Amino acid sequence: MSQILLQPANAMITLENVNKWYGQFHVLKNINLTVQPGERIVLCGPSGSGKSTTIRCINHLEEHQQGRIVVDGIELNEDIRNIERVRQEVGMVFQHFNLFPHMTILKNMTIAPMQLLHKSKEEAEKTALELLGRV
Protein backbone atom coordinates (compact mmCIF):
# COMPACT_ATOMS: atom_id res chain seq x y z
CA MET A 1 0.00 0.00 0.00
CA SER A 2 1.53 3.34 -0.99
CA GLN A 3 1.84 6.14 1.53
CA ILE A 4 -0.20 9.26 0.81
CA LEU A 5 1.75 12.49 1.29
CA LEU A 6 -0.33 15.05 3.17
CA GLN A 7 1.94 17.93 2.18
CA PRO A 8 -0.09 21.03 1.27
CA ALA A 9 -0.15 21.76 -2.46
CA ASN A 10 3.08 23.32 -3.72
CA ALA A 11 4.60 23.56 -0.24
CA MET A 12 8.39 23.75 -0.22
CA ILE A 13 8.79 22.70 3.41
CA THR A 14 6.25 20.94 5.60
CA LEU A 15 6.63 19.87 9.21
CA GLU A 16 3.82 17.71 10.59
CA ASN A 17 3.66 17.03 14.34
CA VAL A 18 7.45 17.05 14.67
CA ASN A 19 8.82 16.10 18.08
CA LYS A 20 12.41 16.08 19.31
CA TRP A 21 13.84 15.26 22.72
CA TYR A 22 17.27 15.71 24.23
CA GLY A 23 17.10 13.04 26.89
CA GLN A 24 14.08 13.97 29.03
CA PHE A 25 13.90 17.54 27.64
CA HIS A 26 11.11 17.78 25.04
CA VAL A 27 12.50 20.60 22.89
CA LEU A 28 10.16 20.41 19.86
CA LYS A 29 6.53 19.67 20.73
CA ASN A 30 4.20 18.82 17.84
CA ILE A 31 5.65 21.46 15.50
CA ASN A 32 3.55 22.14 12.39
CA LEU A 33 4.87 24.47 9.71
CA THR A 34 4.27 25.05 6.00
CA VAL A 35 6.58 27.18 3.86
CA GLN A 36 5.57 27.98 0.28
CA PRO A 37 8.10 28.37 -2.56
CA GLY A 38 9.73 31.80 -2.46
CA GLU A 39 8.40 32.51 1.02
CA ARG A 40 10.88 33.72 3.61
CA ILE A 41 10.32 32.94 7.25
CA VAL A 42 11.98 33.88 10.50
CA LEU A 43 11.88 31.73 13.61
CA CYS A 44 11.82 33.99 16.65
CA GLY A 45 11.81 33.04 20.29
CA PRO A 46 13.81 33.06 23.50
CA SER A 47 16.97 31.07 24.00
CA GLY A 48 16.20 27.37 24.30
CA SER A 49 12.84 27.55 22.52
CA GLY A 50 13.88 25.23 19.67
CA LYS A 51 14.59 27.66 16.81
CA SER A 52 18.00 26.25 15.88
CA THR A 53 16.87 22.69 16.53
CA THR A 54 13.96 23.15 14.10
CA ILE A 55 16.31 24.44 11.41
CA ARG A 56 18.79 21.65 12.07
CA CYS A 57 16.00 19.05 11.79
CA ILE A 58 14.88 20.47 8.43
CA ASN A 59 18.39 19.87 7.07
CA HIS A 60 18.68 16.60 9.04
CA LEU A 61 21.66 17.83 11.05
CA GLU A 62 19.52 16.70 14.00
CA GLU A 63 17.19 13.73 13.86
CA HIS A 64 13.59 14.22 14.96
CA GLN A 65 11.99 11.33 16.84
CA GLN A 66 8.36 11.76 15.75
CA GLY A 67 6.43 13.40 12.96
CA ARG A 68 7.20 14.09 9.31
CA ILE A 69 9.44 16.58 7.56
CA VAL A 70 8.98 16.97 3.79
CA VAL A 71 11.20 19.28 1.73
CA ASP A 72 10.22 19.86 -1.91
CA GLY A 73 8.32 16.57 -1.94
CA ILE A 74 11.20 14.61 -0.37
CA GLU A 75 10.44 13.07 3.01
CA LEU A 76 13.37 13.17 5.39
CA ASN A 77 13.77 9.71 6.79
CA GLU A 78 16.64 7.26 7.16
CA ASP A 79 17.27 7.12 3.39
CA ILE A 80 20.60 8.94 3.02
CA ARG A 81 19.86 9.71 -0.64
CA ASN A 82 16.89 11.84 0.43
CA ILE A 83 19.00 13.66 3.00
CA GLU A 84 21.78 14.40 0.49
CA ARG A 85 19.27 15.73 -2.08
CA VAL A 86 17.76 18.10 0.46
CA ARG A 87 21.14 19.30 1.73
CA GLN A 88 22.14 20.26 -1.82
CA GLU A 89 19.06 22.46 -2.21
CA VAL A 90 18.31 23.91 1.23
CA GLY A 91 20.25 26.96 2.39
CA MET A 92 20.28 27.93 6.03
CA VAL A 93 21.46 30.94 8.00
CA PHE A 94 22.34 30.18 11.58
CA GLN A 95 22.69 32.57 14.49
CA HIS A 96 26.35 33.06 13.60
CA PHE A 97 27.10 34.21 10.08
CA ASN A 98 30.10 31.93 9.71
CA LEU A 99 29.42 28.24 9.95
CA PHE A 100 33.11 27.48 10.50
CA PRO A 101 34.59 30.38 12.50
CA HIS A 102 38.17 29.23 11.87
CA MET A 103 37.66 29.74 8.11
CA THR A 104 37.33 32.91 6.04
CA ILE A 105 33.95 34.04 4.73
CA LEU A 106 34.99 32.97 1.23
CA LYS A 107 35.94 29.48 2.41
CA ASN A 108 32.66 29.20 4.34
CA MET A 109 30.78 30.07 1.13
CA THR A 110 32.69 27.66 -1.11
CA ILE A 111 32.87 24.54 1.04
CA ALA A 112 29.34 23.27 0.24
CA PRO A 113 29.46 23.88 -3.54
CA MET A 114 32.84 22.16 -3.72
CA GLN A 115 32.08 19.19 -1.46
CA LEU A 116 28.38 18.59 -2.16
CA LEU A 117 28.01 19.80 -5.73
CA HIS A 118 31.56 18.87 -6.80
CA LYS A 119 32.22 22.30 -8.29
CA SER A 120 35.79 23.35 -8.94
CA LYS A 121 37.42 25.75 -6.51
CA GLU A 122 37.53 28.40 -9.23
CA GLU A 123 33.82 28.03 -10.07
CA ALA A 124 32.79 28.04 -6.40
CA GLU A 125 34.91 31.12 -5.66
CA LYS A 126 33.57 32.96 -8.71
CA THR A 127 29.97 32.37 -7.59
CA ALA A 128 30.78 33.30 -3.98
CA LEU A 129 32.48 36.54 -5.02
CA GLU A 130 29.49 37.44 -7.23
CA LEU A 131 27.17 36.89 -4.27
CA LEU A 132 29.42 38.87 -1.94
CA GLY A 133 29.36 41.71 -4.46
CA ARG A 134 25.62 42.04 -3.85
CA VAL A 135 26.00 42.81 -0.16
Where are the model-predicted features located?
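Short coil-to-helix segment of the ABC ATPase nucleotide-binding domain corresponding to the Q-loop/switch region
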Residues: 102-112
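ABC-family P-loop ATPase nucleotide-binding domain
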Residues: 1-19
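ABC ATPase NBD Q-loop/coupling interface
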Residues: 68-85
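Helix-to-loop junction immediately C-terminal to a conserved catalytic motif
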Residues: 59
